Amino acid sequence: PTRRPVARWPRWPRKSPSGADPDTLTAQEIKDRIRDAGIVGMGGATFPTHVKLSPPEDKKIDHLILNGVECEPYLTADHRLMLEDPDNIIGGILILKKVLGVEKAIIGIEANKPDAIELMTKACAGRGIEVGALKVQYPQGAEKQLIYALTGREVPSGGLPMDCGCVVQNVGTAAAVNDAVRRGIPLIERIATVSGSAVNEPKNLRIKIGQPLGKLVEFCGGAKGELGKIIQGGPMMGMAAVSLDVPATRGTSGVLLFSEGQVLKEPEGPCVRCGNCVRACPAFILPTEIAFKTKK
């Protein structure tokens, strides 16, 4: 139900006086426009995009990775964006390629989105952009896992994607970059999924940054039943919100509402060192040791 078309209302003018043809701009001028427009990572981390596009001179970047995986349950905002506005995404990718000086760009999309894979593959034809269909598993959208899945490269322990020649950006970030550079539109809105068991009419919405979450839920038919949990973002990596009066931010990829009966409230039990968390960890760390040391 959350894969419905994006609900729309009047937007910023599609082209403002501050928009420019990226072909007439230098890489630094483009980065300045991205910075001035307030563009950040739209996947949820909200790391400043212009900083990510400025690796040290000794770090040779040869791959631009676009994250269209969206592996968090319930969230389908990036999916809808790829289906409804692929040209905006591709325009942003071409700008990012110019800034980084790379020839290789790959969009990673999970195989459970065949419509997006097909559409983006056709839209990218002849533009130096590839689409990689990835196995459906969590956390496929995490930077290190995504880089390994698409390139076979491993980010060094304690390192960053730039240490293996890659820069990763979300597809929503690419679209925002295109809006900022070509049209002069700052980051004042984004696509977000409003869903969960306690939402009457789950939808994807184009939301204004700063709108109270309650207004978004109201647009989706309101909440039903007693609310047990409100989450900004996905159920795995999102942040709990104290109330629906909290404003949406640039990192609000979703607003999830769950009923009281769906929220697990069991007390924490002792670790019996069964090893299940170690086997499940995609980064091969030892969660048991982390838990033990935090309690010490």
Q: Which residues fall in each region the model found?
A:
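Acidic low-complexity segments
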Residues: P1-M42, F47, D58, P114
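Short acidic, glycine/serine/threonine-rich loops at helix termini
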Residues: R11-K15, A45, V51-L53, L75-H79, ...
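Metallocofactor- and cofactor-centric catalytic cores in central/energy metabolism, strongly enriched
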Residues: G38, A45-T46, H50-P56, D78-L83, ...
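Gly-rich Lys/Arg/Thr-decorated short loops/hinges at beta-loop-alpha junctions or inter-strand turns
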Residues: L64-D78, A198
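Histidine-anchored nucleotide/phosphate-binding helix
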Residues: L83-V99
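Hydrophobic alpha-helical positions that pack around
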Residues: E103-L213, F219-K224, G234
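A glycine- and small/hydrophobic-rich beta-loop-beta segment
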Residues: I191, F219-G222, K229, G238-V272
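Ferredoxin-type iron-sulfur electron-transfer modules in oxidoreductases and energy-metabolism complexes
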Residues: S253-E268, N276-K296
